[in-house]
Amino acid sequence: MKAPIEVSPLAWLDAVEQQRRAAGLRRSLRPRPPVATELDLASNDYLGLSQHPDVIDGGVAALRLWGAGATGSRLVTGDTELHQQFESELADYVGAASGLLFSSGYAANLGAVVGLSGRGALVVSDAYSHASLVDACRLSRARVVVTPHRDVDAVLAALADRDEERAVVITESVFSTDGALAPLRELHEVCRRHRALLIVDEAHGLGVRGGGRGLVFEAGLAGAPDVVMTTTLSKALGSQGGAVLGPAAVRAHLIDAARTFIFDTGLAPAAVGAARAALGVLRAEPWRVGAVLRHAGVLAEVCRVREVPQSAVVSVILGDPDVAVAAATACLDAGVRVGCFRPPTVPAGTSRLRLTARASLDDAELEVARRVLTDVLAGLG
C-alpha cells in the first residue's frame, strides 16, 4: 500500500491568499505607537475622549476598585454596581427606559437581533448594514429580506407581503461606510403600521447626532415602545463594549435569551469606568458634538465631496481597490492615517478612502489634512 500523500488540511489557504492578492484585497496589521506620530483621520474616536484625562482616570479608578477582569459572566460573578449604574445613566442620556451592557457592540447586535427575532419571524435589513448585523441575521433563523440602501418603500413592501406574525426591521442610524443617515421617522412609521419592531444601531450616531444623544433621539423616537437601540462604547465614548437600550421588557428578555450576554464574560470594569467618565465629559462639554460636524465639513470640502457631511464619516469613493490602497498609503507616507475600505466591506467598484473627523482636531492639524489630501488626490489624476 502506498504511503499517504502528506497534504496539510490548510493547503487551500495558499490559493485563497493568492486570490486576495490578485484582487487587491489583502489586509495587514500596522501597530500604532502609544503617542501618535501621524495625524489620525481613521479612528472612530470621534470626540477625542480615548485620551481625555477624566476618561483615563475613570478607567484606572474602576480597575483599582474592581480588578482587571469581570471574572465571569454577568449572571455569575461578572456583574457589579458599576455596570448597573452605567446602564441606567446611558439609558437616561439617550431617553431609553433601560440598558444592558455587552462585551462589544458586535455582541450587542447579535444579542438584540437574534434574541428579538428567531424562527418564524421576518427580519428586514438594509443592504449596507454592518457585518455584525449581517451575522445576526444569519444566526437568527428568521426569514431575512435585504433591502436596497435606505429604501423605505422596499421595507414597506417586505412587511406588507409577509406571512410571519413577528417582524423586525434593522438599520444603522449613521451608516459606517458612507456616513449617510437612515430615514428613521419614515422607517418607524412603516414599522408602526405593520406591527414591526425597529432595531437601530447607533454605533456612529451616539455622540454625533441629536446633540450627542443619537439619531433616534433627534428623530423624536427615544422611549418609543417599538424601538430598540444598540450601540458601542468604543467610538464616541472612547472605551470598549456595547449596549442594548430600550423598553424594560427587552432588557429582562435579553438577560434570559441573548446568548452573547449569558455565555460571555462581563465587560471589564475598567472599560465601564472609562465609558461612564466619557459620558460625563459628553454631558459637560457639548461643544465636542458641533466640532465633529464642522471638521467633517472641512474634510469633505478638501476632498470635493458634494454632499455636506451629516456625521463624522467622510467617504471618498475611488472605485478600484488598488487605487484606494495606493491613496491611503500615500497619505500615511505623508503623515496622515486614513481609512481604506474595500470589498467585501463595501460593494465592488466602490473602494474608498474613509475619513473620520474628530472634535479634538485643531487648526494646524486641519491645515496638514488639507495639504496632504489635496496633494494625494491630485496625484491620482
UniProtKB/Swiss-Prot annotation:
Homodimer. Pfam families: Aminotran_1_2. This is 8-amino-7-oxononanoate synthase. Substrate binds at residues 27, 130, 345. The keyword GTP-binding does not apply. Pyridoxal 5'-phosphate binds at residues 105-106, 176, 201-204, 232-235. Its EC number is 2.3.1.47. It catalyses: 6-carboxyhexanoyl-[ACP] + L-alanine + H(+) = (8S)-8-amino-7-oxononanoate + holo-[ACP] + CO2. One of its GO terms (biological process) is biotin biosynthetic process. Catalyzes the decarboxylative condensation of pimeloyl-[acyl-carrier protein] and L-alanine to produce 8-amino-7-oxononanoate (AON), [acyl-carrier protein], and carbon dioxide. Its cofactor is pyridoxal 5'-phosphate. GO terms for molecular function: 8-amino-7-oxononanoate synthase activity; pyridoxal phosphate binding. The modification N6-(pyridoxal phosphate)lysine is found at residue 235. Pathway: Cofactor biosynthesis; biotin biosynthesis. It is an enzyme of class 2 (transferase).
